[in-house]
Amino acid sequence: MEPEDTQLKEDIKTTVNYIKQHGVEFENKLLEDERFSFIKKDDPLHEYYTKLMNEPTDTVSGEDNDRKSEREIARPPDFLFSQYDTGISRRDMEVIKLTARYYAKDKSIVEQMISKDGEARLNFMNSSHPLHKTFTDFVAQYKRVYSFTGQEIKKSKRTILDNCFERTQYWEFEKDKDREHDKLVELCKIQFAAIPWDKFTQVAKFSIPEDTEIFEGSLDLEQMRLRRVQTGIKLFDSIKPTNEEEKIVSDQGKQKGGDSKGKKRKIRAVGETRLKKSKK
């Protein structure tokens, strides 16, 4: 019985492709997962699963190959008349739009008004003003509107419809890419879960001499890290003072000062020297 759900059908086809690539062990691993119940014989979808397993690989993956062979759809240009800063107050936006409209029609009118009255509210016309880009964008939009005639607008209806169709195609293409990415992530999780982590393979052997009595311990990564840090600290010991002569002079001064302090001096009481002289 073929499933009615399109997404479920795609999941079964993708699972079949992976099982054909990785063998029966992959199928046995998926039996433990309830999401792949169609692998079990008592499941209603097992017949459809078996049918796909018996089909050639090219037939099963034909739709995927056709999807991958589709050409890349170029990103459509941004909307010209709806891309502007939305963080501007309504009053300021009206002033900018009205000024841009007059400027696109005849910029001399606006320039005369600025030179005559020195209107401070039109500072956004200066290139250093934060709203200058918004002003120039609206000027370009109004110039584009004024450049079209009635006949050209009638002729451009077909172009507008074609652009809308291409934009819709691009959006659908982006949605398909997102779905493919999500499906790939899910399959990677399935493949990771199917790895027999409880089974190991012997890669190599190493022998220890029989006369060995003391075995070296395993590497202590923490000690290795500390050892490197200590080695780096020793680099500071080799740095000499910026002024070696000043250091030598200061060391000599300290030594002399230490000698003078080291001599013992006898401090006499007040008038003791005078009394000794009078006795003589």
Swiss-Prot record:
Major localisation: nucleus
Domain of life: Eukaryota
GO cellular component term, pick one: U2-type prespliceosome
SMART domains membership: SWAP (SM00648)
Localisation: Nucleus
Chain residue ranges for the region called Disordered: 53-72, 246-280
Positions annotated as SURP motif repeat: 11-49, 95-135
UniProt keyword list: mRNA processing, mRNA splicing, Nucleus, Repeat, Spliceosome
Pfam family, one: PRP21_like_P
PROSITE patterns referenced in this protein's UniProt entry, alphabetically: SURP
Result of changing residue 168 to A: In SPP91-1; corrects the PRP9-1 growth defect through partial restoration of splicing and by a complete reversion of the pre-mRNA escape phenotype
InterPro entries, A to Z: SF3A1, SF3A1_dom, Surp, SWAP/Surp_sf
Gene Ontology biological-process annotations: mRNA cis splicing, via spliceosome; mRNA splicing, via spliceosome; U2-type prespliceosome assembly
Ranges annotated as biased composition (Basic and acidic residues): 246-261, 269-280
More info: Present with 2490 molecules/cell in log phase SD medium.
Subunit structure: Belongs to the CWC complex (or CEF1-associated complex), a spliceosome sub-complex reminiscent of a late-stage spliceosome composed of the U2, U5 and U6 snRNAs and at least BUD13, BUD31, BRR2, CDC40, CEF1, CLF1, CUS1, CWC2, CWC15, CWC21, CWC22, CWC23, CWC24, CWC25, CWC27, ECM2, HSH155, IST3, ISY1, LEA1, MSL1, NTC20, PRP8, PRP9, PRP11, PRP19, PRP21, PRP22, PRP45, PRP46, SLU7, SMB1, SMD1, SMD2, SMD3, SMX2, SMX3, SNT309, SNU114, SPP2, SYF1, SYF2, RSE1 and YJU2.
Protein name, per record: Pre-mRNA-splicing factor PRP21
Organism of derivation: Saccharomyces cerevisiae (strain ATCC 204508 / S288c) (Baker's yeast)
Species classification: Eukaryota, Fungi, Dikarya, Ascomycota, Saccharomycotina
Gene field: PRP21
